[in-house]
């Protein structure tokens, strides 16, 4: 992977990630394909929304279908027929989400399969091996996602163990002679000094990119912004910056303003299936009865297949009847909305008009533009 940085405005960055399988324009949003599919979508449909790269889930793909079946197909690209870049998470967050059915030790994590209750062990080495079998273009280190809330001492112990796991991930990645890219994950909770210690340790080990983990796990939005403002300028400028698991459209806007290059989140797809649709004027809840006879498109500024061909009334009808097509059309729209937002942010950075773009983004939804500190590198 090669990262090119074209231009900046304040801390916002416009660039690209260049892989053998294709180029990813940044800032970028990655749709989530947990089980090797973006729910309800063919790879061609996902690509048509503007996506350059997908996220796959190491934990779930390890449990089903497993490494053996994956290798029989070649890798995850061949299995799901997506011949563009794929980033896979390490499984750490999913293990964190298991709660009481997992036990974390220095060696790794013991847990019971959420599928059949089988006892399973996952450690940094195994995570690297699984991601190698997936053929991931971007591999994430195995870490512990520090919970929120956590005391400073708890966050420190968690972060320091993640650093030790980062070294083990690096060593196993190199032993496997994996030709792809490995990203480190900065932990430390809401504590700036711990974030510094984590980042410095990761830079000493050396990675192809750096993710900010352990955010969007319940902390106040102000804390997320504060940590991003503190950490992003300290990440090596020639490496991509990835904010994991974020988020709402405004979170993407605010992340870009603070120097983030990459995002992922299930929100556009999950919300689509629940009838929450993103538009240039805010969220539309298609299940609201006022859409029953509305012949207008979801968003007259949107160029997606759904908006070009169907009315709000039709989408309301499909939802009321629990038709699969409704969830699919909603997903196409929400994913295209996210990609259009990223296209707009990239264009605004290129032309030096990011402030105007941000103002229009908020005012078109009847919202105030949030104040941010003067951000410059």
UniProtKB/Swiss-Prot annotation:
Pathway: tRNA modification; tRNA-queuosine biosynthesis. The active site is at 89 (proton acceptor), 264 (nucleophile). The keyword Transport does not apply. Zn(2+) binds at residues 302, 304, 307, 333. Pfam families: TGT (PF01702). It is an enzyme of class 2 (transferase). GO terms for biological process: queuosine biosynthetic process; tRNA wobble guanine modification; tRNA-guanine transglycosylation. Its EC number is 2.4.2.29. Its cofactor is Zn(2+). Substrate binds at residues 89-93, 143, 187, 214. InterPro entries: ArchSynthase1/Queuine_TRR, TGT, TGT-like_sf, tRNA_ribo_trans-like. GO terms for cellular component: cytosol. Binds 1 zinc ion per subunit. GO terms for molecular function: metal ion binding; tRNA-guanosine(34) queuine transglycosylase activity. Residues 245-251, 269-273 are annotated as: RNA binding. Keywords: Glycosyltransferase, Metal-binding, Queuosine biosynthesis, Transferase, tRNA processing, Zinc. Belongs to the queuine tRNA-ribosyltransferase family. Catalyzes the base-exchange of a guanine (G) residue with the queuine precursor 7-aminomethyl-7-deazaguanine (PreQ1) at position 34 (anticodon wobble position) in tRNAs with GU(N) anticodons (tRNA-Asp, -Asn, -His and -Tyr). Catalysis occurs through a double-displacement mechanism. The nucleophile active site attacks the C1' of nucleotide 34 to detach the guanine base from the RNA, forming a covalent enzyme-RNA intermediate. The proton acceptor active site deprotonates the incoming PreQ1, allowing a nucleophilic attack on the C1' of the ribose to form the product. This is Queuine tRNA-ribosyltransferase.
């Amino acid at each position: 992977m090669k990262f090119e940085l074209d231009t900046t405005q304040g801390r916002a960055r416009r660039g690209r990630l260049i892989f053998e399988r294709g180029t990813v324009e940044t800032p970028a949003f990655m749709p989530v394909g947990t089980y090797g599919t973006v729910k309800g979508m063919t790879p061609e449909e996902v690509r048509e929304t503007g996506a350059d790269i997908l996220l796959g889930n190491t934990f779930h793909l390890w449990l089903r279908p497993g490494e053996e079946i994956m290798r029989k197909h070649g890798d995850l690209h061949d299995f799901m027929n997506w011949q563009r870049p794929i980033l896979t998470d390490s499984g750490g967050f999913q293990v964190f989400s298991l709660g009481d059915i997992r036990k974390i030790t220095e060696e790794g994590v013991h847990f019971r399969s959420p599928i059949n209750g089988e006892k399973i062990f996952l450690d940094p080495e195994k995570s690297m091996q699984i991601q190698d079998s997936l053929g991931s273009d971007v591999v994430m280190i195995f870490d512990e996602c520090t919970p929120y809330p956590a005391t400073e001492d708890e966050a420190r112990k968690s972060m320091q163990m993640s650093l030790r796991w980062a070294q083990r991930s690096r060593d196993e990645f190199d032993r496997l002679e994996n030709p792809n890219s490995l990203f480190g994950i900065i932990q430390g909770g809401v504590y700036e000094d711990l974030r510094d210690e984590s980042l410095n340790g990761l830079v000493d080990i050396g990675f192809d990119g750096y993710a900010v983990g352990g955010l969007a796990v319940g902390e106040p939005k102000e804390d997320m912004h504060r940590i991003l403002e503190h950490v992003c300028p300290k990440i090596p400028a020639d490496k991509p910056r990835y904010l994991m698991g974020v988020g709402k459209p405004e979170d993407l806007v605010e992340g870009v303003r603070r120097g983030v290059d990459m995002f992922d989140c299930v929100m556009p797809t999950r919300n689509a299936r629940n009838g929450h649709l993103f538009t240039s004027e805010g969220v539309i809840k298609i299940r609201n009865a006022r859409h029953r006879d509305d012949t207008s498109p979801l968003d007259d500024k949107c160029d997606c297949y759904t908006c070009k061909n169907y009315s709000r009334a039709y989408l309301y009808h499909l939802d009321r009847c629990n038709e699969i097509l409704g969830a699919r059309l909603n997903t196409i729209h929400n994913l295209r909305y996210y990609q259009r937002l990223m296209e707009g942010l990239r264009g605004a950075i290129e032309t030096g008009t990011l402030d105007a773009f941000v103002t229009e983004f908020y005012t078109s939804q009847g919202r105030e533009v949030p104040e941010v500190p003067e951000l410059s590198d």
